[in-house]
Regions:
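Conserved phosphotransfer microenvironments
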Residues: 55-70
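Short, conserved "switch-loop" micro-motifs in signal-transduction and mechanochemical regulators
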Residues: 87-88
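Short, flexible helix-to-coil linker/hinge segments that flank and couple to helix-turn-helix
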Residues: 94-97, 108-138
Length: 138
């Protein structure tokens, strides 16, 4: 029996980074169906591939990634959007979730990416702990 794979699309600013993410998923049940360099291309490709998950490395343009997340959330509500960032900042995480993201992962702190993505596809909202706001003191 052939294992079921889940289609994933990646947006990133460099071929090298996208290749590294693709290689991370080789021995998993994720199948990278497309890698693109900007949000507009991601939205267009999503119409064709209907991905289960879109992984956004937003380093070059946070605004572009937010716009893509909003469009994917509206046009493809079953696609889970995950931001994959070098920015360990609650402001970025909050903006990502407001734009429809299901996850916000910090690259330097993500040791088991495929496990986290699987949890997100099961409906969990995952946000790197360091990006959580500090509780206010009463």
């Amino acid at each position: 029996m052939t294992p079921i794979t889940r289609p994933v699309m990646i947006i990133g600013d460099s071929s090298r980074a996208m290749l590294a993410l693709t290689e991370t998923m080789v021995d998993s049940d994720f199948d990278v169906v497309a890698s693109v360099m900007d949000g507009e291309s991601l939205v267009l490709a999503a119409q064709h591939y209907q991905p289960a998950l879109a992984l956004l490395d937003f380093t070059p343009s946070f605004g572009d990634a937010l716009a893509a997340s909003r469009q994917l959330s509206q046009n493809h509500p079953t696609t889970k959007v995950v931001f994959f960032s070098t920015h360990d900042d609650a402001t970025y995480a909050a903006a990502a979730f407001e734009a429809g993201a299901a996850g916000f992962l910090v690259k330097q702190r993500t040791s088991d990416l495929t496990s986290l993505l699987t949890r997100i596809l099961r409906g969990e909202r995952i946000q790197h702990p360091a990006t959580l706001p500090t509780p206010s003191r009463q």
